[in-house]
Regions:
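Short, charge-rich binding segments
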Residues: 80-87, 113-114
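Short, glycine/acidic-rich beta->alpha junctions
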Residues: 27-30, 104
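Class I (Rossmann-like) S-adenosyl-L-methionine-dependent methyltransferase catalytic domain
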Residues: 1-16, 21-24, 31-82, 121-193
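A short glycine-rich, Lys/Arg-flanked "PGG" loop and its adjoining helix->strand segment in the class I
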Residues: 106-121
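A short SAM/SAH-binding and catalytic strip from SAM-dependent methyltransferases
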Residues: 88-106
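Gly/Ser/Thr-rich loops at beta-strand to alpha-helix junctions
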Residues: 30-32, 98-99
Length: 193
């Protein structure tokens, strides 16, 4: 496991401290350190392993081809993102969006936007290595408000790579997109609904 400083997480957490009692979504799967950190701030946390849900729904055969199958997409959305509108005050999306192909990616971003209350924030990470055939995947764990622990989960082929312009387009229906410069292979983004 490795740790990294995260300016994006620090900004996300500064928004949480201002308003206790929020309802948050964590797509990295349940882990003790993140749960303890967020609940100690007085928040409720819903957790789901988004990558595991993707593997269950699309992993039999060609992972990205299966994301175009309407039945599998419906099964995935019901399993991973079946929450009411405006249910969450924030979401930790991590790097999960990189593994969704075009139409499904747009559907998931719309669904996330619908699940978030107006004015809420979402933290997402994107790999900056545009020429890499595979990228490392991690289970992200919050150690403190400025530090993330990355537990390796192997490597995957991303559906696509994102530069700042493509991220602005992806989140065009949101109020704002803020980018954080990092010294490693991850681009941090905070999106405001």
């Amino acid at each position: 496991m490795e740790t990294r400083n995260s300016s994006g997480l620090d900004q996300f957490c500064s928004l949480l401290v201002e308003r206790p009692g929020l309802t948050l979504l964590d797509l990295a799967g349940a882990n003790q350190s993140t749960m303890a950190f967020l609940t100690n701030l007085g928040h409720r946390v819903y957790s789901d392993d988004f990558l595991l849900q993707m593997d269950r729904c699309f992993g039999d055969g060609d992972f990205y081809e299966n994301q175009a199958d309407p039945e599998k997409v419906a099964q995935f959305l019901d399993a991973a993102l079946d929450y009411p509108a405006q249910h969450f005050d924030g979401a930790l999306v991590w790097d999960t969006l990189e593994f969704l192909s075009g139409p499904l990616l747009e559907t998931v971003v719309q669904r996330l936007g619908n699940m978030l209350r107006p004015g809420s924030y979402m933290l997402a990470l994107f790999h900056a290595e545009e020429r890499a055939a595979t990228i490392p995947t991690y289970s992200y764990r919050i150690q403190d408000r400025k530090t993330i622990t990355l537990a390796p989960r192997g490597r995957r082929h991303p559906a696509q790579f994102f530069n700042n312009r493509s991220l602005e387009k992806l989140f065009q229906d949101f109020q704002s997109v803020k980018f954080f410069l990092t010294r490693d292979h991850l681009r941090e983004v905070i999106v405001r609904r």
